Amino acid sequence: MAPAPKLINWKRNLFVAWLGCFLTGAAFSLIMPFLPLYVETLGVTGHQALNMWSGLVFSITFLFSAIASPFWGGLADRRGRKLMLLRSALGMSIVMLLMGMAQNIWQFLALRAVLGLLGGFIPNANALIATQVPRNRSGWALGTLSTGGVSGALIGPLIGGLLADQYGLRPVFYITAGVLLTCFVLTLLYVKEQFTPVQKKDMLHARQVFAALKSPKLILSLFVTTMIIQIATGSIAPILTLYVRDLAGDIHNLAFVSGLIASVPGVAALMSAPRLGKLGDRIGPERILVFMLIVSVLLLIPMAFVQTPWQLGVLRFLLGAADGALLPAVQTLLIYNCTNQVAGRIFSYNQSFRDIGNVSGPLMGAAVSASYGFRAVFCVTALVVLFNAVYSWWCLQRRPTRMREDTLQEE
């Protein structure tokens, strides 16, 4: 018989998982500043072709991740989450190494697709911690864990740009592979999991997974919420620099100001996520989720009417503070309303919806701005988030009032 789960030092696992998410977030964002430049070195010429290929190599990773996530989630429920962390870190390390050796754009595109197939360190880390931490500490733990990937993604572009200037483009891929290999070694040595493998014949099928849930409709609504959160975040990304230029006029440090305004939401999320997660443990993650969605709407609307970049920067900082609570609240509600037996698949389905949002958001933002202008993007995004707030509130109201208390008592 497996040892009692209480023997797991979940706080140490949380620390190592946070470090792994930080390294993974940094590794992925290391290459982002010069991705179009690398595409150009692979033989792509012309403004239109460069834009098309840059968009393809960026989005194909998310598309293939959305396809592969449910498979890896099922394997996590059968073989354990630590194995999935190791598989993801090592697989991504090898692919990053090969990316640095790519000789043409087709090889690079194929490797970006494989990267999506083999990814998933952060969602698997979320599933591992969510199934180990005491339920009454879930909000704080998942909020804290979310800061790992965010902080890595914030520092990655800065370091990646410096490394590319110093050593060239290809060596950055080799350095990134080394970072991911470090993540693999740390996970192998220090993450502990007590998991009894499940035979394939004993596994629940996808339909049975949802039938076994306390509230399948609620879980589906949380998936949709995750997708809309990513759509709202991504819709602004394609037009942000151009919007800042419209607000600022001809300034010599446009790239710096745009980068600063792009990064302030992440800084705010770092500060707010653990605190709001802890508050959610006290008052309920459902209240945090709905309230912060409404706050996001109230911050998005005035962004359409700002007159200076600094006004936009302040509003985006406040928006980041609100957004920092959203995904941890969703993940906490997911673990409240599913069993450990199916947690891997539930989190993987959620990751698929997140990837769909990552692809759809920039497309929506680009389409709206092309037709109606930059300011309309913020209004349309606010409407989408408002729908999400109302939809989430409605679904959470239909949940049995004792559901959360019953889930807590199971621990």
Swiss-Prot record:
Transmembrane segments: 14-34, 56-76, 89-109, 113-133, 144-164, 171-191, 219-239, 254-274, 288-308, 376-396
CDD domains from the UniProt entry: MFS_MdtG_MDR_like
Main location: membrane
GO cellular component labels: plasma membrane
Gene3D superfamilies linked: MFS general substrate transporter like domains
UniProtKB keywords: Cell inner membrane, Cell membrane, Membrane, Transmembrane, Transmembrane helix, Transport
Top-level lineage group: Bacteria
Topology term for the membrane: Multi-pass membrane protein
Location in the cell: Cell inner membrane
An example Gene Ontology molecular-function term: transmembrane transporter activity
UniProt cross-references to PANTHER family, sorted A to Z: MULTIDRUG RESISTANCE PROTEIN MDTG
Family: Belongs to the major facilitator superfamily. DHA1 family. MdtG (TC 2.A.1.2.20) subfamily.
Record-linked NCBIfam families: PRK09874.1
UniProt-listed HAMAP family: MFS_MdtG (MF_01528)
Name assigned to this protein: Multidrug resistance protein MdtG
The gene coding this protein: mdtG
